[in-house]
Amino acid sequence: MVKISPLNLKLLRDVGQMKGQMFAVGIVMACGLAMMIMARSLIFSLESTRDAYYERNRFADVFSNLKRAPNSLRARLAEIPGVAAAETRVVGSITLDLPGLAEPADGTILSLPEDRPQQLNLLFLRRGRMPEAGSHNEVVAGEAFALAHGFEPGNTIAATIHGARQTLKIVGIALSPEYVFEARAGETLPDNRRFGVFWMNERELATAFDLDGAFNNVLLDVAPGGDRAGVVLELDRAGQEVWKVPLQGRPFHAVRY
């Protein structure tokens, strides 16, 4: 039989006299532990959902902006060691004339390939359809902007693209892994009434920005286990002096402008 020291006996008596307080402390500790487990489970669930969404819609690993590069460079990009898929596109800014706004809104417009399947940053179409090949002024609008203005497929928007005023017809509303929330570069909070994201057929958008036969944006998907830094270096070599800004990989998953 283990002998209990007088101090331990006193401790047990004191604990016995404070049953209510000890029970309350135990409840607080149990609640804290439960909250920690719930928070960790929620974080794990959100991360798993995010990763599955990015993988399902083939979110690119490397993005690069250019002034101009010929479409013939596309094949060279796909041959870079460690690259699983390469996508080139035209990206630009537009000004929007919207009713109810005292000042013009603005947006980003991105091209959709017509002569080949889209490989990266796939759109998830919520309503409507994609622009038809050879169509004129048909666009897909980001869902956040469409909801802020009550736009539906079939509505039109007055826009200025590279100095030319056009009437854009919304044929679809979509989500994109590239725009977890739709905001201007550098903004921490979205302003969905004054900024929107749109997608248009590549040939028409390239013509609007005087980029016929060329592109100004690159997306790369790095193969599993690939060296992202090495891919960026090879991309820089492939483009040589045509790149506009230093290349940047995807530093985090939370937001991509």
Mark where each language-model region is.
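Membrane transport/envelope proteins' first extracytoplasmic loop
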Residues: 1-257
